[in-house]
Amino acid sequence: MSVPAKLGFVDKVRAHLELLDPVTWISVFPCLAAGVMASGAMKGTVHDYLLLLAMFLMFGPLGTGFSQSVNDCFDLELDRVNEPTRPIPSGRLSPKEGLANSIISLLLAIGLGVFTGLHVGGVRGMIIMASIMFALFVAYIYSAPPLKLKKNILTSAPAVGFSYGFAPFISANALFGDVRPEALWLASLNFFMAIALIILNDFKSAEGDKDGGLKSLTVMIGARNTFLVSFTIIDLVFAVLAWLSYTWGFMIPTFFVLLGLVLSMVIQVQLLLDPKGGISFMNSAVKDGFGNVLGKSDVHEHNAFLRYQIANNALFLVNNLIVAGMVGFKYL
């Protein structure tokens, strides 16, 4: 890919934003929203909305952005194969500029986390600060040697589950109220759902992972078995959510969670029968309606995952928010 010898200011800014991978920022918001709803303590004031915005900036553009930026810094050679159009391998940003991007994002995330934690105060404030600090630390060792957690799915998937699922949920829950057992249960389910989805997301880089010695599940056991492992985790998450909803006395939400489980399993069967072309009727949704958000891929299994992700995320998101809202309502 040919790149001008010197990019203009606007193009440099665009390259820095692309390095932070804005399409990934929104991934933490459902967990933040559910965490806040489960607290039942947020008030419709400007103050509380600003706190929620600070939490989103901390885990979204800054925290998630840092994880994407630092990953590109350490994976330059791998990205030349898997994603050669990214800012650093394409030459739009130098490795030093990429490093500066990640350092600035890290410092801003830490600063905002400390400020928010001190503002909230007490044990809740400590939970917020500890969550963002540990999430940032995990994001670093995910990509950086010598640990480089992403080298093996057994360490990379839990790292993603914590940073994208558990930590945002717990932090948002602590923002306005005490962290209760119900919140810990729901945060744990978000942790496992994130694990299940990141397993499937590795389809897009299977060839590069194999050449680079990374042990993704797809490389180790193949596409069909990877689908089977991920679907088992997803179905267990739905089943446990239904059980929790029932034991907490939420009868109507229990029905909707079970309905979501059944619908998800119907789609899963089609993908297991045809890992490359299953649920092809949703192709237009990926290419047109959601293509810019979810991304596109030349790998058939990854495109199948993108189609499934639309349906699964909608089913889990709605049920997760409903149950979290009922928990919060119980403590009003």
Which residues make up each language-model segment?
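Multi-pass alpha-helical membrane architecture of UbiA-family
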Residues: M1-L332
